[in-house]
From Swiss-Prot:
Species name: Aquifex aeolicus (strain VF5)
A cellular component annotation (GO) from this entry: plasma membrane
Keyword annotations of the record: Cell inner membrane, Cell membrane, Membrane, Protein transport, Translocation, Transmembrane, Transmembrane helix, Transport
Protein name, UniProt field: Protein translocase subunit SecF
Gene Ontology biological process: intracellular protein transmembrane transport; protein targeting; protein transport; protein transport by the Sec complex
Compartments reported by the entry: Cell inner membrane
HAMAP family recorded: SecF_B
InterPro entries (alphabetical): SecD/SecF_arch_bac, SecD/SecF_bac, SecD/SecF_CS, SecD_SecF_C, SecD_SecF_C_bact, SecF_bac
Family to which this protein belongs: Belongs to the SecD/SecF family. SecF subfamily.
Record gene name: secF
Assembly mode: Forms a complex with SecD. Part of the essential Sec protein translocation apparatus which comprises SecA, SecYEG and auxiliary proteins SecDF. Other proteins may also be involved.
Regions that span the bilayer: 13-33, 123-143, 145-165, 175-195, 226-248, 252-274
Role played: Part of the Sec protein translocase complex. Interacts with the SecYEG preprotein conducting channel. SecDF uses the proton motive force (PMF) to complete protein translocation after the ATP-dependent function of SecA.
Disulfide bonds: none
Bilayer topology term: Multi-pass membrane protein
């Protein structure tokens, strides 16, 4: 079977990656992220209607009233929990609720900005801790430059996913942050599979250049990469299309992340390691 020379395309891939990162960073800079209630603070309402109310119609009616930053959930007890972000015209919510008949306000709570600020710090700390752990693990298992290659691919994926949320102005909440961390782990797993095969082939194959070894290794793991990515992508796409608003919002991170992560494990991580090895003129990679 003919081998695909992936790494011959790395300069074009660098251009694609640079464009993705540039667009993402510009959007994050000028549009920002649509942070959810978990990060901004707001007000929580729990109401119970006398008659049965469809959650989809309720969500659409609230949105039509000009309230954009909100979440709505239906409980097992038949009540609706509505969370509205700070700065939204909450005074319109009462008028919306009246359209669905008589209702009882069970509770109303304020989520303070202090709590939200703490959540932001925890989210950033979780991401930085994950990045540090990955760098340490790969640096010990392979070489520091390999670890940096994986981190570069990981940063590429996270920035692109965040950029996609910024461009579409989808809400970023704690569930989305968790999804991004899962996507990060998925991306690293893909990269480690390729790196492992490269290390194995470096020991077995003699008389080949590093680029040839890398291309061979990527081709050998290609079927596994494609099957794993397609399986995950089909599942994520199904839930993204058929799931409700909250689930669709989370699955958006998986859809974008799986596509970008598969691409980066080949064209970012491996390409970076190859060019760094060439830069320092190291013919072989010393493995742990």
């Amino acid at each position: 079977m003919k081998q695909i020379k992936f790494l011959r395309l790395r300069k074009a891939a660098y251009g694609v990656s640079a464009l993705l990162i540039l667009i993402s960073l510009l959007s994050l800079l000028f549009r920002g992220l649509n942070l959810g209630l978990d990060f901004t603070g707001g007000t929580l309402y729990e109401v119970k209607f006398e008659k049965s109310v469809d959650i989809g119609k309720l969500r659409k009616t609230i949105s039509s009233a000009g309230i954009k930053g909100f979440l709505i959930q239906e409980t097992k007890e038949g009540t609706f929990v509505i969370k509205v972000k700070t700065g939204e015209p909450v005074e319109k919510l009462e008028d919306v609720l009246k359209k669905f008949g008589k209702y009882e306000l069970i509770r109303k709570e304020t989520i303070s900005g202090v709590v939200s600020e703490e959540l932001q710090k925890k989210a950033v700390f979780a991401i930085l801790t994950a990045l540090g752990g990955i760098l340490l693990y790969l640096g010990v298992r392979f070489q520091p430059v390999w670890g940096f290659g994986a981190i570069l691919a990981l940063a590429h994926d996270v920035i692109t996913v965040l950029g996609a949320y910024s461009i579409t102005q989808r809400e970023v909440n704690l569930e989305v942050v968790s999804a991004i961390l899962v996507v990060a782990g998925y991306s690293v797993a893909d990269t480690v599979v390729i790196f492992d095969r490269i290390r194995e082939n470096l020991r077995k194959k003699k008389g080949f250049t590093l680029e040839e070894i890398m291309d061979l290794s990527i081709n050998q793991t290609l079927s596994r990469t494609i099957m794993t990515s397609l399986t995950t992508l089909v599942t994520a796409l199904t839930l993204f299309i058929l799931g409700g608003y909250a689930l669709s919002n989370i699955m958006f991170a998986f859809v974008v992340g799986v596509v970008v992560g598969t691409y980066s494990s080949v064209f970012v991580a491996s390409a970076f390691v190859l060019d760094m090895q060439k830069l320092f003129k190291r013919g072989e990679v010393q493995t742990a």
